[in-house]
Every structure is written in structure tokens, then in C-alpha cells.
């Protein structure tokens, strides 16, 4: 307000400068806050099934892909890396998961590489994180896969509590019970003071797996 400016949300990658989607200043407040808006004019954005490559119907989660003037031609002198993200139809695969709604707005829901595969079930950490944020006393939460001898991976929740709050693992599981699918309820629950971060302040989600193994060892928790 001090700068007499209105804020919109823009989603994209360095490889899709200046972006892939954006909301408009005249969009409703909930659209500007809860989505990343429409695709840019003269570009194509689609949500595809990572396993089949087919375009997902409205409301179904898949990988965000982009084609158009805003898509890079390739990585400098690195054709192998280019081939990993640009397909034969010149669509760039972002690695991000998203959903397109009935109004054509997109919502980012997570990262493919963060997906937890538990006994053949695909579990998206962000879904569980958003659910656990509703638990009173939770300040911040991250969910990651912890290696499992039986299932390949199990769900691990790393929780930062609000100041002065005391909570037990049983409190978290009781909150989840009968509200989310049983296989999505965290097997391992860790109360931590901070998350591993980059120098720029981004959470290093890939390090949570190692942190979980370390905490299990320190606390005498058997990995099943």
C-alpha cells in the first residue's frame, strides 16, 4: 500500500523466464492467494501424468510442463541435461506437481522427487504437511520419506512446535486418525528446532531423510 502497488503471484523456472503462469491484479483475492494463475498468452502449459505422459483431466495432479517463447532452447553445452527436461515435442518438464482447476488456474502441489513411495502407494508430502498445519501448536512441518525395510519408504514428519507448546507423538497420530488414509499417517514423528536450510533460506528437503535416520539412531528407534 505504501508503494501504491498491487501484488500478483507468478510461477516459473529459470528455464521458463519470465515465468509459466501468473495471476492478474483484478483476479479475486482467493485466486491470487491460492493459485499461480493462468498460463501466459502465446504459451502452452499442461499437466501430465508422469508415468504415462498423458495430459491429466481438470482437478487431477500431475507434472507441470511448458512450451512456447518462454522455454529455453537448452543448457549450454550440456545436451544430456537438456534431453532430461525437454521432450520431443519441446515441452519443458518442470519436475513440479500441480493441478489445473475448472477456471484454468493452476495450483502447485509439490515436487516429483519429494514423492514418497510406500509399498506401491504414491504419497505427496505437501498434502500431509497442509493437514498437519491444522493441528494446534504446530508452527512448521516438513514431511519426507524414511527408508523402510518392509515398504521401501515410510512417512516421516518433522515438526517445529510453537513456543511453549508440548506435544507427544501420540497427539499427532490421534489427530490424523480417521481423517487421512492410514498409509499417510506418519510412521516416524520428530520434534525439531529447525530444518536443514540453504544459504538463501530454502529448506533442503533431501537432507531430511538422513536427518530422520540419524534421529532414529539417536533415539533407539528401529527402522522397520
Locate each region found by the language model.
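AMP-binding/adenylate-forming catalytic core of the ANL superfamily
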Residues: 12, 68, 73-74, 81-84, ...
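Acidic/polar alpha-helix N-cap and adjacent early helical turns
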Residues: 210-224
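Adenylate-forming AMP-binding core of the ANL superfamily, especially NRPS adenylation
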Residues: 30-77, 85
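Short, glycine/acidic-enriched loop or turn micro-motifs at the edges of active sites
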Residues: 15, 52, 99
Amino acid at each position: 500500500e505504501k508503494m501504491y502497488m498491487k501484488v500478483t503471484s507468478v510461477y516459473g523456472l529459470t528455464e521458463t523466464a519470465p515465468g509459466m503462469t501468473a495471476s492478474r491484479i483484478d483476479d479475486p483475492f482467493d485466486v491470487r492467494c491460492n493459485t499461480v494463475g493462468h498460463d501466459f498468452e502465446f504459451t502452452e502449459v499442461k499437466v501430465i501424468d508422469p508415468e504415462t505422459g498423458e495430459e491429466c483431466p481438470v482437478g487431477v495432479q500431475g507434472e507441470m510442463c511448458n512450451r512456447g517463447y518462454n522455454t529455453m532452447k537448452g543448457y549450454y553445452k550440456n545436451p544430456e541435461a537438456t534431453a532430461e527436461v525437454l521432450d520431443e515435442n519441446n515441452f519443458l518438464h518442470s519436475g513440479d506437481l500441480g493441478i489445473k482447476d475448472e477456471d484454468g488456474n493452476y495450483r502447485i502441489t509439490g515436487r516429483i522427487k519429494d514423492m514418497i513411495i510406500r509399498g506401491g502407494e504414491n504419497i505427496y508430502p505437501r498434502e500431509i504437511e497442509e493437514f498437519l498445519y491444522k493441528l494446534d501448536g504446530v508452527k512448521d512441518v516438513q514431511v519426507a520419506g524414511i527408508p523402510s525395510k518392509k515398504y521401501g519408504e515410510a512417512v516421516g514428519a518433522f515438526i517445529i512446535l510453537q513456543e511453549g507448546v508440548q506435544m507427544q507423538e501420540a497427539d499427532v497420530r490421534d489427530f490424523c486418525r480417521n481423517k487421512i488414509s492410514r498409509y499417510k499417517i506418519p510412521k516416524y514423528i520428530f520434534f525439531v528446532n529447525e530444518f536443514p536450510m540453504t544459504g538463501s533460506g530454502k529448506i533442503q528437503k533431501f537432507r531430511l531423510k538422513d536427518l530422520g535416520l540419524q534421529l532414529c539412531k539417536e533415539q533407539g528407534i528401529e527402522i522397520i
